[in-house]
């Protein structure tokens, strides 16, 4: 496993007075199984029916959790990570469907931003993806975490393509060409999945 914090091992922000706590969310057990093997799990706490695995990896405190599928589950899980575990960062990991012709099976997309492709109030005049009465509808990823993810991917010995791009999230499994084309047209997503924009 490539070191998620790059060569230094720890996520460094300039404020090194305490260990950073990283929450890592996967919607399904398959999406965090590999990480569970690598993280030194110290304890498991059950909150709202979810098992939060607390441990350490490369000098960071880690909280691993399976949120369940969909945006509501992901949002609730994220709030628990913040309220109960005081995480400094939240990382969403998992599988997605490619909307970018340059991405193949096993390739990696590092999110630059995320949008809800199924948020549609276009009948009221807003573009698809726009959340009414909210200042932002496209949620930007943390630039420091993007850089760290790129460095970790570059250190890996695995052979796969890594690109930066937009995550398009919705509470639906996209299984048709028409569905893919709609997301590309309206929100310019590079991949489609079911949790990221809610985290």
Language model: regions and residue ranges:
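A glycine- and small-aliphatic-rich helix-loop capping segment at beta-alpha/alpha-beta transitions
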Residues: 31, 37-43, 83-84, 104-115
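Short, positively charged and aromatic/hydrophobic N-terminal segments
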Residues: 3-10, 15
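N-terminal short beta-loop-beta anion/metal-coordinating cradle
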Residues: 19-79
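Mid-sequence, gly/pro-rich, charge-dense loop/helix-turn segments that line enzyme active sites
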Residues: 99-187
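Short glycine-rich, acidic/polar surface loops and turns
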Residues: 193-199
């Amino acid at each position: 496993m490539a070191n998620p914090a790059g060569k230094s091992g720890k996520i460094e922000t300039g404020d090194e007075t305490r260990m950073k706590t990283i929450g890592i969310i996967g919607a399904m057990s398959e999406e965090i199984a590999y990480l569970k093997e690598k993280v030194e799990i110290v304890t498991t706490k059950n909150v709202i029916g979810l098992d939060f695995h607390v441990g350490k990896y490369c000098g960071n405190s880690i909280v691993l959790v399976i949120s369940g599928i969909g945006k509501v589950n992901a949002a609730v899980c994220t709030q628990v990570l913040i309220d109960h575990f005081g995480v400094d960062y939240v990382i969403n990991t998992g599988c997605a469907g490619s909307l970018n012709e340059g991405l193949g099976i096993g390739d990696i997309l590092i999110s630059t931003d995320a949008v809800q492709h199924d948020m549609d109030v276009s009948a009221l005049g807003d573009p698809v993806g726009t959340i009414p009465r909210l200042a932002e509808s496209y949620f930007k990823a943390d630039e420091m975490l993007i850089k760290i993810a790129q460095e970790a991917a570059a250190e890996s010995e695995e052979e796969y393509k890594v690109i930066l791009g937009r995550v398009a999230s919705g509470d639906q499994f996209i299984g048709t060409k028409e569905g893919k084309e709609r997301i590309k047209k309206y929100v310019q997503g590079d991949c489609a999945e079911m949790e990221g924009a809610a985290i």
